[in-house]
Amino acid sequence: LLDRLTEIMQLDREQRAVIVGAGNLGSALVGYSGFASSAFRIVGIFDSNFSKIGRMLWDLEIQDAERLPELNRELQASIGIIAVPAAAAQHVADLLIAAGICAILNFAPIHLTVPDHVTARNVDFLRELEILSYHLDRPRCLGDGAASAQ
């Protein structure tokens, strides 16, 4: 059963991904050690800041985001990860789609408009924190923080 699920989710083959945004979040994602033991491989990092383009980040050279459609012909990424401010996220999504990428993980706090053949998933840190905040209203968690757990 596990083998069949792995096959259905396409985790039995390498899944190539690019990250757009070489700031704090993008840098952390490129260096995430969990990718080493997964099917996912980060094959490119892109940014629009000319002072970052050409620099090395881990073992990847930061490329100009505007060149993503051209460079993905060689990289062959099928997943794009957006780690840019909200104001730039839709443009980045458009670049990813122009590059032939049909699966997008979006960390920007904005809803993306994508064609029907593209799947976009949003990671909303604030919403997740709100959910955690709701769960704090449990008897053991009421009180003054860590001291109430004792």
Give the location of each predicted region.
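Short secondary-structure boundary segments
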Residues: 84, 107-109
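Hydrophobic, well-ordered beta-alpha structural blocks that scaffold small-molecule cofactor pockets
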Residues: 1-99, 115-140, 150
